[in-house]
UniProtKB/Swiss-Prot annotation:
Its main location: cytoplasm. The gene is pepA. One of its GO terms (molecular function) is metalloaminopeptidase activity. PANTHER family: CYTOSOL AMINOPEPTIDASE, LEUCINE AMINOPEPTIDASE-RELATED. This is Probable cytosol aminopeptidase. The lineage of its organism: Bacteria, Bacillati, Mycoplasmatota, Mollicutes, Acholeplasmatales. GO terms for cellular component: cytoplasm.
């Protein structure tokens, strides 16, 4: 979908549809006189008792005297409640449910009754762009399509901030591309996206000047990454460690920020096999890696002025005569030994070695890891927040604020010695599962043993927000693409060169 910005409407635009935005109970609507010279819409307001509450909509076809065949008015809600998230959702709402009508849509964006900023307009555009994505490539019957806005080819935004918005457009498009790439990776079935196929997807980033390094099984053995390898040994699919480098800083030698992703392309649970109910969702157990790849795409596309390294560990966790067993003890890359209590607590085994590699080989300024790590995080926080754990309060606060700014919210949970002792083992340095309460916390506590206090580190458990959520105002997809927008905001607003 093409997007453009203008300061005022002219008949030469020749659009099929118009969208107006209404602040709740405010008397006037920007663009109403032009769109509806015969004042029919106002009568519709009265008949339908339309007042502009958030998400409310009223639609009109072929209004007499109107230059548009289709007109929709969307409510923004009460003035004091309108924020950046409102505009993100409004963008998705505005392009929804208008199939069969427009090819070109004009949006009168400067809603009367409030001061509309460039940031809010760009959130609106992002919401509209994100809403366009759907994963329907495996339908042979195209009538099953749930996408209701495929016909929109061009979105024309009318705003006094047109010039500034045009300057920001490429940034927003880059974010959308990264989110959609993450969604695509998470949505793909595991028979299509195995470890080797995932590597090939990542290599496409090289076209954007991202340096990609792939370490295979033999190299992982040389490095002593036995925790990661132990997870992979039950599958015929080979394990990989993939390092992605974007050097956008003026100082190419500057310490990078590092983002680590869990990439279990399918998680059966291994010998500690999962229940069959819902196991199909475990194709998304590579969601953390998917987010890191999407983030790297966004940073490279918008040419971020910073050095960033993404590292993902790719494995498949399957039961077989070669699979690891409960009771096995493995020596991680760090030299610390791990007793395997539960083969379904595999993500932390992968991350243990990846985090240690990141800390010792890359030596970054900070590390943020993302993983669909625990089912317990859904019990603790539901689907509204990801879980956040950190050894650095300044970094944690930055991530929390970034989540609030992008509507990808996180909630910080505690770490401490009381939890750490729960993963002590009778036979090794630690065990991979405490087997009791505080499952998300003890999993994070396990990861903490593979980073040090000198390096700011944060772990984001995205198991409840990565996939399977209810569709919302700006997402049509089973996969949410969670994390790309949050981390891009974190980088741009707290670390990137201005």
């Amino acid at each position: 979908m093409n997007v453009s910005f203008i300061t005022q409407y002219t008949s030469s635009i020749d659009a099929d549809a118009a969208i107006l935005l209404q602040v709740e109970k405010f008397e006037k609507t920007f663009g109403l006189e032009l769109v509806d010279p015969n004042r029919i819409i106002k009568k519709g307001y009265l008949i339908e008792n339309f007042q502009g509450s958030f998400g409310s909509q009223i639609k009109f076809l072929y209004l007499e005297g109107s230059p548009f065949a289709f007109v929709k008015v969307v409510g923004l809600g009460k003035e004091q409640s309108i924020n950046d998230e409102t505009w993100l959702k409004a963008g998705g709402l505005c392009v929804s449910e208008i199939k069969n009508y427009p090819k070109k849509v004009v949006v009168f964006a400067d809603a009367l009754g409030i001061d509309v900023s460039t940031t809010q307009i760009m959130n609106f555009v992002l919401g509209a762009l994100l809403k366009q994505y759907s994963f329907e490539c495996y339908y042979t019957d195209k009538k099953k399509s749930k996408q209701k806005n495929k016909n929109i080819l061009e979105l024309v935004i009318i705003t006094k901030n047109a010039e500034n918005c045009q300057k920001e457009l490429k940034q927003v498009q880059a974010i959308c591309e990264g989110v959609n790439l993450t969604k695509e990776l998470v949505n793909e079935p595991a028979n299509i996206l195995g470890t080797e196929e995932f590597v090939e997807k990542i290599k496409k980033l090289e076209k954007l000047n991202v340096k990609v390094q792939v370490l295979d099984k033999e190299k992982l053995k040389e490095l002593g990454m036995n925790a990661l390898l132990s997870v992979a040994q039950g599958s015929s699919r080979p394990p990989y460690l993939v390092i992605m480098q974007w050097n956008g800083s003026d100082n190419k030698e500057e310490e990078p920020l590092a983002f680590v992703g869990k990439g279990v392309v399918f998680d059966s649970g291994g010998i500690s096999i999962k229940h069959s109910s819902g196991m199909e969702d475990m194709k998304a157990d590579m969601g953390g890696a998917g987010t890191v790849v999407g983030l790297m795409h966004t940073l490279a596309t918008r040419k971020a002025k910073i050095n960033v390294t993404g590292v993902v560990g790719l494995v498949e966790n399957m039961p077989s005569c070669h699979a690891q067993r409960p009771g096995d003890i493995v020596t991680s890359m760090s030299g610390q030994t791990i007793e395997v209590i539960n083969t379904d607590a595999e993500g932390r085994m992968v991350l243990a070695d990846v985090l240690w590699y990141c800390k010792t080989k890359i030596q970054p300024k900070l590390i943020v890891d993302l993983a669909t790590l625990t089912g317990a995080i859904r019990i603790a926080l539901g689907e509204q927040h990801a879980g956040l754990f950190s050894n650095n309060e300044a970094l944690a606060k930055q991530i929390i604020k970034s989540g609030e700014a992008t509507s990808e919210k996180v909630w910080q949970l505690p770490l401490g010695l009381e939890y750490d002792k729960l993963i002590d083992s009778k036979f090794a340095d630690m065990k991979n599962s405490s087997g009791g309460s505080a499952g998300s916390i003890t999993a994070a506590q396990f990861l903490k043993r593979f980073v040090d206090e000198k390096t700011p580190w944060a772990h984001i458990d995205i198991a409840a927000v990565c996939m399977g959520n209810k569709l919302n105002e700006f997402n049509n997809s089973w996969a949410s693409g969670f994390g790309v927008r949050l981390l891009n905001y974190l980088i741009k607003n707290y670390y990137e060169q201005k």
